[in-house]
């Protein structure tokens, strides 16, 4: 059951009126610490805040050596870039939106003045289709933050993520979902 793989890595976000998006967000740890990433003003985009990322990476540990990570529905890519900054073995960011994908590439190019310790791939694909093509237990840490307005997307992504997640190395599945839903509703 994927329930065991989520552990305590669950964050809820409030639906409703979207707060003002920051123009820039910063990497908070690792080799890219304090580096700024530009943020698109894109409908449905909700960058994970510094405070939430700090909590997540305190749970995970500051050093992700040996972990293979996926950042699904990557948006700003900040979760994936944080993992890469903290020495993840590999990080794959998946984004379907053409503008968000282009911004991911631009932000990564800026970060490359200090190369990532591991492999970073940014793919312009549908996250669900990508997941379906992956082998069982092929990733250690999976970030899932889908568009909230697309019903059923979260549950489908979780089912596939549970299949490919190998959490034996200390990883797991991190999920962002609307505060209007309970954890039981997505399990």
Residue spans for each PLM region:
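Class I S-adenosyl-L-methionine-dependent methyltransferase catalytic core
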Residues: 1-187
């Amino acid at each position: 059951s994927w329930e065991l793989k989520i552990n305590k890595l669950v964050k809820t976000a409030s639906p409703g009126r979207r707060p003002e998006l920051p123009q820039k967000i910063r990497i908070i740890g690792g080799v890219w610490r304090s580096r700024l990433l530009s943020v698109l003003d894109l409908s449905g985009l909700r960058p994970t805040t510094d405070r939430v990322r700090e909590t997540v990476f305190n749970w995970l540990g500051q050093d992700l050596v040996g972990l293979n990570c996926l950042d699904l529905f990557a948006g700003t890519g900040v979760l994936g870039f944080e993992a890469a900054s903290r020495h993840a073995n590999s990080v794959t960011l998946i984004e379907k939106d053409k503008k968000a994908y282009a911004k991911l590439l631009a932000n990564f190019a800026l970060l490359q003045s200090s190369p990532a310790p591991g492999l970073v791939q940014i793919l312009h694909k549908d996250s669900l289709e990508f997941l379906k093509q992956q082998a069982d237990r092929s990733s250690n840490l999976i970030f899932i933050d889908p568009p909230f307005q697309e019903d059923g997307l979260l549950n489908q992504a979780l089912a596939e993520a549970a299949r490919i997640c190998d959490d034996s190395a200390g990883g797991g599945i991190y999920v962002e979902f609307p505060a209007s839903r309970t954890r039981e509703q997505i399990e």
